[in-house]
Every structure is written in C-alpha cells, then in structure tokens.
Amino acid sequence: MVKIINTSGKRKTAIARATLKAGKGVIRVNSVLLESYGSEVTRMKISEPLFLIPNAVSGIDVTINVAGGGVMGQAEAVRTALARGIVQWHNDPAMKDIYLAYDRTLLVNDSRQKETKKPHGSGARAKFQKSYR
C-alpha cells in the first residue's frame, strides 16, 4: 500500500493543506515548484523546516495547496503544514524536538486573529479625535 500523509497548517485566515507521498523530493506550492514560488522572503520562510533537517524530504514529494490570507500568512501556514507532514512521515520524536526548540509555530497553529474594528474609531482600539471647543 502506498504511504500518503495529509496535513494542514493555519495562520490568520490562510489555510494550507499538504499531501506527502513517496517520490523524488519535489515540493510544489499551488502547483508551482518551491524554487520559483513567491518572493525570496516567502521562500526562506517556507524552507525553514528544510534547513533545520536537511535530508527531511529526500524521497518525498510534497504538494501543498494554500488559500486565503496574505503573502506572509500563507507562507507561515505552508511551513506549518510542511513541518507537520515531515514529522508524521518520519515518525521520529527527535525531529519533533528540533522543530519545537527552534520555533513552536512550526508544529502548532498560531491562532491569533485580527481584532475587529469598533465604532467611533479608525481601528480596533484607536478613537476619532475629540474636540472640546
């Protein structure tokens, strides 16, 4: 039976779904190779799990679909989904410890959301200027 693992990662309103299966070590994000996806900053953010454990995806093809949110929110959702998939694929507690020691949000969703705007102001906490005379 073919080994396939599905994982997901979330950040703000971005949701990334990753599928890992045996292959040649190709990583695709929204059908685009990771080497040509987005800007350099987003590629570096997504590649963090790969830098921590260099041979983690050798022999694994990773397909990630991400939607919602902004550029960096999507990048952080993708890196969470990728790191979770790598840990599940190898089933190695040492890998999990390396990721948790580096950054907890590699394996745990960052559930912080934007605070909603309130009336009588321009944002969540800021109020319109008041004049007394």
Task: Describe the residue ranges of each PLM region.
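Structured, basic alpha/beta domains of bacterial-type, RNA-associated proteins
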Residues: 2-9, 16-21, 25-67, 83-133
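Beta-rich strand-turn-strand
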Residues: 71-79
